[in-house]
Structures are given as structure tokens and as C-alpha cells.
């Protein structure tokens, strides 16, 4: 049987910022069940690589394929990719329920009950209707991460998702990411945190070395 092609594939990828080459000739791919951790020192291009894989930036050279299609600057509505950046990216005046309802509408709408269950999963039961600007940094991070507990894309691209989490939140997120991969999902992640649970499809790439 011919193996399925990678869901996400980057070929001969290069990135340049402020006239400086961050990386070049970079190849990577993800199939169902894979987790790819991107590492490297500050300034090596970790966030830039993730933004390239999301179509939020264009590479200096090379291309990114998502489900066999070249990923351009404008992703198609509802494409099978979920991006969570370093900042929670919440609307301060909206509640967690309202923020998540708006975010889910980009992929697969979710009702109040489903959103309530997602907030409960990240330890925010009872905070559904509190304006997000009143929440702590850790609570805002958990609101954003609640998106991972709602129906949606199978590919998650996450930039430093453990930021501002306590030890319980870190352990819960580690398990959720591993479970997602073991159920056929995919994760690309940057983190300074040492992961204690790795799925079978775990790999890492060090941008300082340019190797996977």
C-alpha cells in the first residue's frame, strides 16, 4: 500500500529578516500522529518558521504544501490548521465564551455548552462570562488554549504555548498534546519547556544546526 503523502510539507525553505538569513534549505514534513518541536536560540527564526508554515509570512525561497496545496499568504477560510501565537490574541472586552465562539466560527462553530466544557478542561469553569481584560496572564493563556479542546483542525501550530501556565496547567497541556497526536492529530510547537510526555511520532528540529 502506498503511504499517504505528508499533510504538511516544506521544501528548501529559506527565511530572511532585516537582511539576515535565519535559515535556508530547510525540509520538513508532518503526517498524522506527528509532533515536531522547533528549537534553537533566540533570534534563530523559530517563530518565523511557524508563521511560514501557517501562511502568515512568505519564504525567501522554497514552498509550503498544506494537504497537497501550495500555502499562500491568504489561507482559505476553514483550512485545516489552527495557529496559536505567543500572545493569547483575545479581544479584551469580550468574555471567554464570546472569544471562543468567534474563534470557532472560523473553522467549526461551537455552542455555549461545548465552550463551557472546554473552559472547564483548562480550569476556568465559572469564568465564561467575565471580560477577558480582568483575567490574569495565565488565565488569558488558558482561554486561548481552550480552543484546543473544541472541534476543529487536526494540525495545531503553537508558539510557546506553556508561557504563563502553572505546573498543573503545563502537565494538562502536555497530556492533551500527546493525546491529540496519538489520536491522529499533528502538532508543530516551539517551547523552552522540556516535554515530559512524547508521542510516538515526536521529532525535533534545531534551527541552529539546520537539521531534523
UniProtKB/Swiss-Prot annotation:
One of its GO terms (biological process) is cytochrome complex assembly. The keyword Transport applies. Residues 8-212 form the ABC transporter domain. InterPro entries: AAA+_ATPase, ABC_transporter-like_ATP-bd, ABC_transptr_haem_export_CcmA, P-loop_NTPase. It is a peripheral membrane protein. Its EC number is 7.6.2.5. Pfam families: ABC_tran. Disulfide bonds: none annotated. GO terms for cellular component: plasma membrane. ATP binds at residues 40-47. It is found in: Cell inner membrane. Keywords: ATP-binding, Cell inner membrane, Cell membrane, Cytochrome c-type biogenesis, Membrane, Nucleotide-binding, Translocase, Transport. One of its GO terms (molecular function) is ATP hydrolysis activity. It comes from the Bacteria. It catalyses: heme b(in) + ATP + H2O = heme b(out) + ADP + phosphate + H(+). Belongs to the ABC transporter superfamily. CcmA exporter (TC 3.A.1.107) family. Part of the ABC transporter complex CcmAB involved in the biogenesis of c-type cytochromes; once thought to export heme, this seems not to be the case, but its exact role is uncertain. Responsible for energy coupling to the transport system. The complex is composed of two ATP-binding proteins (CcmA) and two transmembrane proteins (CcmB). PANTHER family: ABC TRANSPORTER I FAMILY MEMBER 1. This is Cytochrome c biogenesis ATP-binding export protein CcmA. It comes from Pseudomonas syringae pv. tomato (strain ATCC BAA-871 / DC3000).
